[in-house]
Amino acid sequence: MGLGWFGAPEHKRWLAYETHALLHYARAAQVPTGFGWIGQNGEVDPSHPVELWITGRMTFAFSLGALMGIPGCRRYADHGVRALNGPLRDPANGGWYSAIGPEPDAEGRGVPIDPEARKECYQHAFVLLAAATATAADRPGAHELLRDAMAVQDRYWWDEDQQMPVESYAADFTDPEDYRGINAAMHTVEAYLATADVNGEVRWLERALKITDFAVKVPAREPGWSRPENSSA
């Protein structure tokens, strides 16, 4: 039995409906410093902070909506870009905070939940993904965000010797973790591909290929092509 229904008009209409519904629902996640968790009641759950990865993902999704021409998405994409350019930034150490409060301080800066929290590759990958997609949508401030996100990737996250991203650092980008996880690497591949699509720089494609090559070669050495989630540098 074939899968010809993938291209059927009714299926495409269903996909479009679900896309619009999800983006409309996601609007409720907006808070002053980014995007929060949405609870089962459709409202922001105040028990959760504003997390970097959620704000990055939301900015990515609304930027896609803007590229698709879905009404209302541009303002939410712009809000995400402003949050990533502003309160979620770590002005002292560089990079971005993992989690902040929903309200800025008196000077408009983000208030980190834990100033000593480690910086994670997983979370920073979504900054790059959001920046690249918002740049493709030509959102205000996105080009500058992409420039800075690429610089942070070059300086800290890409390990040229290992040909893999570093998993995490201390808050001040010291103490790199001797661990390589496929989850963070997977999302880094996604972000690198999006970046290459936007700026045409081959090095991002080459890095993505190195990561996927690592992910494939390890299970090739294991019985049954078993892919372990964790490994060391």
Each PLM stretch: what is its role?
Residues M1-A233:
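Glycan-recognition and catalytic cores of secretory/periplasmic carbohydrate-active enzymes
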